Amino acid sequence: MALWIRFLPLLALLILWEPRPAQAFVKQHLCGSHLVEALYLVCGERGFFYTPMSRREVEDPQVAQLELGGGPGAGDLQTLALEVARQKRGIVDQCCTSICSLYQLENYCN
């Protein structure tokens, strides 16, 4: 009887620590292969679309400027296009830099 009373707090602790299915994936940081695995899990047979920018495009704003067809002083339209491109949120920004939910991942399914 005394042994059972000693294990009662441990049993209560284990019950409280049990993960609940609905809370197992609320919001998480997902990067690299973890992000791809989560997309496979969420999208299943539908598949998903993901076109990452190259490191050069991310690090060098002049590359994006040249791709828009201009150089320095090309005009306000080019400046506006660059600003919109910077504000555009991709899946990496949503899930790796910030946190995302399964519902946000579903937006990237086909």
Curated annotation (Swiss-Prot):
Keywords: Carbohydrate metabolism, Cleavage on pair of basic residues, Disulfide bond, Glucose metabolism, Hormone, Secreted, Signal. One of its GO terms (molecular function) is insulin-like growth factor receptor binding. CDD domains: IlGF_insulin_like. One of its GO terms (cellular component) is cytoplasm. SUPFAM superfamilies: Insulin-like (SSF56994). InterPro entries: Insulin, Insulin-like, Insulin-like_sf, Insulin_CS, Insulin_family. Residues 1-24 form the signal peptide. Pfam families: Insulin. Its main location: secreted. Disulfide bonds join C31-C96, C43-C109, C95-C100. Insulin decreases blood glucose concentration. It increases cell permeability to monosaccharides, amino acids and fatty acids. It accelerates glycolysis, the pentose phosphate cycle, and glycogen synthesis in liver. Heterodimer of a B chain and an A chain linked by two disulfide bonds. Belongs to the insulin family. This is Insulin-2. The lineage of its organism: Eukaryota, Metazoa, Chordata, Craniata, Vertebrata. The gene is Ins2.
